[in-house]
Amino acid sequence: MTSHLKKVELHCHLEGAAPPALTLAQARKYNVDTNAFMRDGVYLWKDFAEFLVCYDKVSEVYRTEEDYALLTETYLEELAGIGTIYSELIVSPDHGDRIGLGADAYMEGVSAGIRAAKEKSGIEARLIVTGERHFGPERVVKAAEYAAKSDNPLISGFNMAGEERMGRVADYARAFDIAREAGLGITIHAGEVCGAFSVADAVELVRPARIGHGVRAIEDADLVKRLADLGTVLEVCPGSNIALNVFPDFPSHPLRKLRDAGVRVTISSDDPPFFHTSLKREYELASTAFGFSDDEINAMTRTAIEAAFLDEATRAALLARL
């Protein structure tokens, strides 16, 4: 199907990519009982709120710089094995602080994993620092300040994730101003759990180059046209959207409608093992569930490289590999 195609992923949360087998090994290492959040190699949750709790439980078994290097390298090697040439990982230095590891050690572990994976397979990767909306504006601003001041060359963008129903986008706008002034690429989660208004607010108040998900924009034809006119890129994660019941099934998912309306769309996996998916599956779904041709899928991959937060020399090299 799509195994012969090069792949790019712009939207994946690092801890959300933790393979259950690795999480189980980590839990045994730290003597953590996994029954509350994992059974038979499957992460357990029922709705978005429970998903966030499960996500945090899984994250708790990754505790050291070495743990994060291992997690990062493991996921990137998985991607490289299916023909992925570039990945952006959404990471949270604030999480490093919360678990007592520290933001710097957390980021160094992740960065070491990126370097190790690149040395083995040649895969390129960058880091998107995220603030988590449900922890409030001050924490999101702190995350932006961390990203803005960091001298880590792998940090290339800033994002806001978490519980979309908490607070107004306006409450968090300062964080994005800080990141933008530092030259970081700007993306934001919107239009996933909440409707088209969430995307409209993000466009108006944050002015992002990209939007994580953004699929609920389909509910407002004028907004869809605006996204197309602006060239705003959507990081679409169909498997995640179905798993979270954003849409009931793939025939009702608007990926093709958005693309046909001129919106620039890309394909990602979000939190793959939580949603019983993978980047490989997302590309296959583009073919089987949405009916995209190889040329159309390659065009979305090209869009992802064009929209990636990275230097122009690396972008040109990646485009040459398609």
Curated annotation (Swiss-Prot):
What is the cofactor note?
Binds 1 zinc ion per subunit.
> Family per UniProt?
Belongs to the metallo-dependent hydrolases superfamily. Adenosine and AMP deaminases family. Adenine deaminase type 2 subfamily.
Q: Does Metal-binding show up as a keyword for this record?
A: yes
Q: What GO MF terms are annotated?
A: adenine deaminase activity; zinc ion binding
Q: What does this protein do?
A: Catalyzes the hydrolytic deamination of adenine to hypoxanthine. Plays an important role in the purine salvage pathway and in nitrogen catabolism.
User: Residues at site: Important for catalytic activity?
Assistant: H213
Q: Which HAMAP family match?
A: Adenine_deaminase
What is the disulfide pattern of this chain?
none
Query: What's the protein called, per UniProt?
Result: Adenine deaminase
| Residues at the active site | E192 (proton donor)
Positions contributing to Zn(2+) binding: H11, H13, H189, D270
**A Gene Ontology biological process annotation?**
hypoxanthine salvage
Question: What cofactors are annotated for this protein?
Answer: Zn(2+)
Q: Where does substrate bind?
A: D271
- One Pfam family here: A_deaminase
Q: Which reaction does it catalyse?
A: adenine + H2O + H(+) = hypoxanthine + NH4(+)
Which keywords does the record carry? Hydrolase, Metal-binding, Nucleotide metabolism, Zinc
User: What EC numbers are recorded for this enzyme?
Assistant: 3.5.4.2
Give the superkingdom in one word. Bacteria
InterPro entries in the record: A_deaminase_dom, ADE, Ado/ade_deaminase, Metal_Hydrolase
